[in-house]
């Protein structure tokens, strides 16, 4: 699952991954959350952090409130805007779950492979 409010970024990410993964795309976190609430639980979510309505951190927290701890996250960002988002980015970077824009396709694949192989116990809320 890819969640990004920028259509161009969303399309590029999907194209980079569609040959290797089953990709679903959402332009906002609320729509992605609604899909997950209906039982469409992905193995991994690639999400922008800075999005209107619901940012990546709030999206992450809502997924965890649903009790979905098996879904892994890889966050992408152009840089923190608030102190709260900076702290969240630091936590995700420490876990190897953050990719800074701009990035190349091979960097995305490497980060995604690393995310998929990390143990769920490494989630910061545990």
Locations of regions flagged by a protein language model:
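Two-component/phosphorelay signaling modules centered on CheY-like receiver
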Residues: 7-24, 93
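Acidic, metal-coordinating helix/loop segments flanking the phosphotransfer/catalytic sites
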Residues: 25-44
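Conserved phosphotransfer cores of two-component systems
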Residues: 37-40, 62-71, 91-93
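Receiver (REC) domain active-site loop signature in two-component systems and cognate sites
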Residues: 51
């Amino acid at each position: 699952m890819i969640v990004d409010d920028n259509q161009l970024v969303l399309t590029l990410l999907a194209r980079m991954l569609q040959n290797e993964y089953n990709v679903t795309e959402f332009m906002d976190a609320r729509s992605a959350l609604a899909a997950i609430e209906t039982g469409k639980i992905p193995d991994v979510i690639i999400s922008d952090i800075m999005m209107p309505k619901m940012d990546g951190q709030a999206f992450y927290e809502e997924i965890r409130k649903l009790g979905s701890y098996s879904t892994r996250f890889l966050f992408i960002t152009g840089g923190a805007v608030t102190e709260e988002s900076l702290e969240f980015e630091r936590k995700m970077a420490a876990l190897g779950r953050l990719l800074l824009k701009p990035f190349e396709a091979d960097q995305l694949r490497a980060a995604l492979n690393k995310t998929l192989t990390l143990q769920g116990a490494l989630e910061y809320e545990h």
